[in-house]
């Protein structure tokens, strides 16, 4: 997990909805694609900033991480707007959405799904769980046991789920936005390093400014505002944006800097250095 992401947020988005196969057959985004993309991204960020007040940098980083194809971890004390930010992103991105409220008695099957015997067919059938969505909100993920937390590992890394010896692909694109409370809070479990390493970004929203807090007190309920949001992007647009990120050229001088930066993290005796997966995320 890292706290940096690609700064190139102006990705290519289609001006009209097209089949995914047609999108990926395009050789390169045109100037009009970029202009259209800038308008859509600006519109999305403006609407999200009206919901999550006084946090423009957090909003920009969260959106950048999603468009870069990464998973997002929001860490803060309860009531800071973590869930609101995640729900706002889901609605504005126009993706299918599931929310799982993690608890200490939750089992992996509650997330992944399970095989249930169908008497009419005389066979077991797999019933998919809430993870079979494009954007999964794992709310208060560290309130569940490490065994349940580990149920997300394969899905976050390989975008698939294996149950009873069979592998099921997840919808594309697939993102996890997880929220967690500080370890000082009662009833929480630390996330394992293998899971932390699968998050591209870890963000903390912090307290609002006095002006933003006054607006919260005087304004409309955030939950009501969320209901009024309409999708700005859609599945094809998000996939095309991800393709645009992959096409961003990274110069050798930047790669040299990344390797020096990573080497510094691995030289410390106080914490583990950045993994190769983290290096690829930085790129």
Where are the language model's segments positioned?
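Pre-Walker A (pre-P-loop) alpha-helix and adjacent loop at the N terminus of AAA/AAA+ ATPase modules
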Residues: 34-77
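Conserved AAA+/SF3 P-loop NTPase catalytic/coupling segment centered on the Walker-B
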Residues: 132-157, 171, 186-195, 207-215
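AAA+/SF3 P-loop NTPase mechanochemical coupling elements
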Residues: 125-134, 163-180, 191-204, 277
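Basic, amphipathic alpha-helical bundle interface domains used for macromolecular binding and assembly
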Residues: 221-283
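AAA+/P-loop NTPase substrate/partner-engagement loops
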Residues: 92-120
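Conserved alpha-helical scaffold flanking the Walker A/P-loop in AAA+ ATPase domains
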Residues: 60-64, 117-137, 166
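Walker A/P-loop
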Residues: 63-103
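Conserved AAA+ ATPase "SRH/arginine-finger" region at the nucleotide-binding site
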Residues: 101-106, 200-212, 228-232, 248-250
């Amino acid at each position: 997990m890292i706290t940096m992401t690609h700064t190139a947020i102006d990705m290519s988005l289609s001006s009209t909805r097209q089949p995914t196969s047609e999108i990926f057959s395009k050789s390169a985004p045109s100037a009009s694609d970029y202009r259209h993309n800038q308008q859509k991204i600006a519109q999305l960020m403006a609407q999200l900033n009206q919901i999550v007040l006084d946090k423009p940098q957090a909003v920009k980083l969260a959106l950048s991480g999603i468009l870069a194809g990464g998973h997002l971890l929001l860490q803060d004390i309860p009531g800071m707007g973590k869930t609101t930010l995640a729900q706002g992103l889901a609605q504005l991105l126009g993706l299918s959405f599931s929310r799982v409220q993690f608890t200490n008695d939750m089992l992996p099957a509650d997330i992944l799904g399970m095989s249930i015997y169908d008497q009419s067919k005389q066979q077991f059938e797999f019933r998919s769980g809430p993870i079979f969505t494009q954007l999964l909100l794992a709310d208060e993920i560290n309130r569940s046991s490490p065994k349940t937390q580990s149920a997300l590992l394969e899905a976050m890394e390989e975008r698939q789920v294996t149950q009873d010896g069979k592998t099921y692909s997840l919808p594309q694109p697939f993102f996890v936005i997880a929220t967690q409370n500080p370890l000082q809070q009662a009833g929480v479990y630390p996330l394992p390093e293998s899971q932390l390493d699968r998050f591209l970004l870890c963000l903390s929203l912090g307290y609002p400014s006095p002006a933003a807090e006054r607006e919260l007190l005087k304004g409309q309920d955030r939950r009501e505002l969320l209901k009024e949001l309409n999708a700005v992007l859609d599945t094809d647009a998000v996939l095309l944006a991800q393709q645009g990120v992959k096409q961003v050229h990274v110069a050798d001088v930047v790669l040299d800097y990344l390797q020096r930066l990573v080497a510094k993290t691995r030289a410390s005796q106080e914490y583990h250095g950045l993994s190769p997966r983290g290096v690829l995320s930085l790129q």
